[in-house]
């Protein structure tokens, strides 16, 4: 047992006895769950006649969050600070016993966690070290993190069809979408947590299509070579009415060459521009037009939507069927179920540009399709090989317009209209 030095004793003339006073180690607590103990110590008292005194051994550890704290933010982090002592080891564990990582500074006086905490969990911090007297020192503390009413998981997407991370390069018309799996009550709070950085600097803004979807686009088409980086720091943040972010999102991409195709409904021709230069004029056949009401009361039309479409995805072969929009009777003259080659999807409602070798006489002369842009074999191969997701296919001269929510249809809106969709 380690015993502190004895106090000096007084020698009295004529008295042959000496009184020795022994100091005794004592224990104290820091809150209900922060326990202090010097290993090897005992308790007791010493003193002279008429009273007793207790001496506490030096050194202790201070905890942040405080012992027994509740509703702790998962972003606050955990700090252990040594006072009149040094830290040797720190164990921060969740209820499953998993260790949370942290760093101890060089002088062994401060330890800080380096991982985010989990929601609604009780954590235990166990610290061991040595006090300034060279004695072992141990303390523990417990705290509980906030338990949200509900959580929402955000997704960083290039479109309805694909996550942004699936590609590293996109065309000049690429936008950035954040999807939430729960409706966000406080859109402004969520939008403040979003950041887009571009190199070179590019003006852009966010537009809320719904409480579950917000989209960023630049004021003008992105310049080739631009790097776009986006982050959404939602984890640990209240997005309204106790709905907290379940995770952060981040991603980036680089803008490829400028590739823009402009299809004219009147001339039945499509001009293709690469980096601002017209490189090809392609005979096409667009949607034949007309509207009909289906048995369920819904209405469909066979126009190609006017406006700037963004290429969403490509496939060497795609099954296309009229059943996708309700025409299921094989006897119906508008029924079809075919395997189509060299397809590039440009809207959620089934618009593509693709090879169409069955109506070549109509290319450049008449609109006969069900809404797609029909192209001959040689030109469709070139378009398929040349155009990539994020490239622009603009349609002009039809009586129906693309919806902002149809694919990446936000380019249909003016910049002033787009800015009105911001929550800030």
Question: Residue spans of the language-model regions?
Answer:
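Exported/periplasmic cell-wall-interacting domains
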Residues: 172, 303, 321-424
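Structured segments of extracytoplasmic/periplasmic soluble domains
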Residues: 179, 183, 314-318, 382-386, ...
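Conserved beta-strand and immediately adjacent loop positions that scaffold enzyme active sites
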Residues: 89, 126, 193, 269, ...
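A short, structured loop/turn motif at beta-sheet edges
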Residues: 132-133, 148, 221-226, 277, ...
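Short, glycine/acidic-rich beta->alpha junctions
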Residues: 214, 254-255, 262-265, 374-379
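Acidic, low-complexity Ser/Thr/Gly/Pro-rich repeat segments typical of extracellular/periplasmic
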Residues: 2-257, 284
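Short peripheral tails and domain-boundary helices/loops at the edges of structured domains
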Residues: 151-153, 163, 259-267, 412-424
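Gly/Pro-biased beta-strand-loop elements
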Residues: 243-361
């Amino acid at each position: 047992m380690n015993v502190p030095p004895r106090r000096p004793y007084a020698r009295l003339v004529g008295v042959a006895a000496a009184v020795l006073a022994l100091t005794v180690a004592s224990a104290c607590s820091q809150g209900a769950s922060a326990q202090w103990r010097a290993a090897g110590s005992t308790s007791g008292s010493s003193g002279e006649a008429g009273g007793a005194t207790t001496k506490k051994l030096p050194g202790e550890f201070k905890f942040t969050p405080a012992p027994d704290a509740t509703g702790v933010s998962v972003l606050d982090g955990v700090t252990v600070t040594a006072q009149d002592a040094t830290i040797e080891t720190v164990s921060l564990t969740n209820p499953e016993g998993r260790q949370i990582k942290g760093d101890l500074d060089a002088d062994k006086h401060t330890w800080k966690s380096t991982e985010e905490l989990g929601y609604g969990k009780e954590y235990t911090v166990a610290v061991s070290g040595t006090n300034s007297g060279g004695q072992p020192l141990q303390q523990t503390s417990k705290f509980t993190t906030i338990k949200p009413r509900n959580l929402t998981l955000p997704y960083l997407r290039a479109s309805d069809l694909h996550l942004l991370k699936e590609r590293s390069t996109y065309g000049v018309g690429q936008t950035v979408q954040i999807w939430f799996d729960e409706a966000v009550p406080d859109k402004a709070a969520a939008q403040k947590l979003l950041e887009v950085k571009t190199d070179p600097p590019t003006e852009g803004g966010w537009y809320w299509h719904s409480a579950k979807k917000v989209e960023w686009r630049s004021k003008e088409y992105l310049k080739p070579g631009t790097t776009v980086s986006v982050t959404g720091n939602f984890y640990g943040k209240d997005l309204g009415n106790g709905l907290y972010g379940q995770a952060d999102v981040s991603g980036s991409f680089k803008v490829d060459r400028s590739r823009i195709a402009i299809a004219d409904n009147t001339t039945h021709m499509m001009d293709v521009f690469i980096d601002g230069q017209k490189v090809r004029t392609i005979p096409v056949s667009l949607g034949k037009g007309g509207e009909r009401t289906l048995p369920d009361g819904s209405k469909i039309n066979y126009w190609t939507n006017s406006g700037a479409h963004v290429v969403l995805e490509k496939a060497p072969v795609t099954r296309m069927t009229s059943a996708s929009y309700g025409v299921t009777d094989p006897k119906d003259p508008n029924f079809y179920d075919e395997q189509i080659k060299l397809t590039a999807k440009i809207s959620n409602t089934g618009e593509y540009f693709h090879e169409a070798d069955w109506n070549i006489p109509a290319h450049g002369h008449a609109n006969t399709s069900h809404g797609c842009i029909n192209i001959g074999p040689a030109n469709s191969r070139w378009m398929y090989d040349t155009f990539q997701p994020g490239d622009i296919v603009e349609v002009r001269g039809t009586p129906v317009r693309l919806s902002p929510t149809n694919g990446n249809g936000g380019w249909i809106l003016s910049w002033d209209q787009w800015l009105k969709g911001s929550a800030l």
